[in-house]
Amino acid sequence: MSTSDMIKQLCEHMNISVAELARRIGQTPQNFNKKLQRETVTLKELITIADALDITYEQVFILHSGAKIKTGNKDAS
């Protein structure tokens, strides 16, 4: 699933439009839709989206040893 598809699915689950999400993160709907179409949403923007919706965003690398290297908008230790 692409990042854009994940964001659209998230909007459906949160019962908001993509345009409303754009406004909540301080972007115009037109600009945000272009980013979705081009798949150019940044990690910083993903974290901003999670913060705006009061949810957790996490990105994880899982090593062969089972150790995890994480980043996200909440405690990513």
Language-model features: locations:
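A short, Lys/Arg-rich alpha-helix, primarily the initiator
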Residues: M1-M14, E20
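Helix-turn-helix DNA-binding elements, focusing on the entry/boundary residues of the two helices
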Residues: I7, V18, P29, L43-L46
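Short, charged recognition helix plus adjacent turn
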Residues: Q9-E12, K34, V60-S77
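Alpha-helical residues within the helix-turn-helix
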Residues: E12, R23, D51
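Short alpha-helical DNA-recognition segment
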Residues: N15-N33
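The DNA-recognition helices of helix-turn-helix-type DNA-binding domains
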Residues: T28, E39-T40, A67
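Amphipathic, hydrophobic secondary-structure cores in small proteins
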Residues: N33-K44, T48
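DNA major-groove recognition helix of helix-turn-helix/homeodomain DNA-binding modules
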Residues: K44-Q59
